[in-house]
A protein has these predicted regions:
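Basic nucleic-acid-binding interfaces
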Residues: 1-153
Length: 153
């Protein structure tokens, strides 16, 4: 993708961020119908604010997004909006989740953010391959529960 600056009335801008955030208690809840619903809600809220999702991936227990946020919004105000509104919309659509989370707080406090410059391709690849890497790490971590002193036979 060619690097193109976006435009507002008197501004040319190219503000890209890699953002990661998690459900409350880092619960592994983003799957099946929840995954599809959360994806649609996040897309809808981003479109409403004029935030372009360049790359994104929903894992069971966290969300990776590469986004382009207009400079009229701070990252913190956008994330407050995204997490706050999406929580309300998720609980409206899936009322049974209130028993797992309570208080209509779906997301944990805070988030990770980094700016994206020349390493955009690297970050895109990282987001795309995140699930594969997590699966490989899970397979490696299974061995730690095996007793090394027991024989094979």
């Amino acid at each position: 993708m060619a690097k193109q600056a976006n435009s507002l009335a008197h501004t040319k801008w190219m503000c890209k961020y890699h953002i990661v955030f998690t459900p409350k208690y880092r619960r592994k809840i983003i799957y099946n119908q929840y995954r599809e619903s959360i994806r649609d809600i996040i897309k809808q809220l981003c479109a409403y604010k004029g935030v372009e999702i360049l790359e994104g991936h929903l894992m069971e227990d966290h969300v990776h997004m590469l986004v382009s946020i207009p400079p009229k919004y701070s990252v913190s105000s956008f994330m407050g909006y995204l997490k706050g509104k999406s929580s309300l919309m998720i609980f409206d659509k899936h009322a049974n989740l209130k028993y797992k989370f309570g208080n209509r707080h779906f997301w944990s406090e805070g988030y990770y953010v980094s700016t994206v410059g020349v390493n955009e391709a690297t970050i895109r690849k990282y987001i795309q391959e995140q699930e594969k890497n997590d699966i490989l790490q899970d397979k490696l971590s299974v061995k730690e529960y095996e007793d090394p002193f027991k024989g094979q036979g």
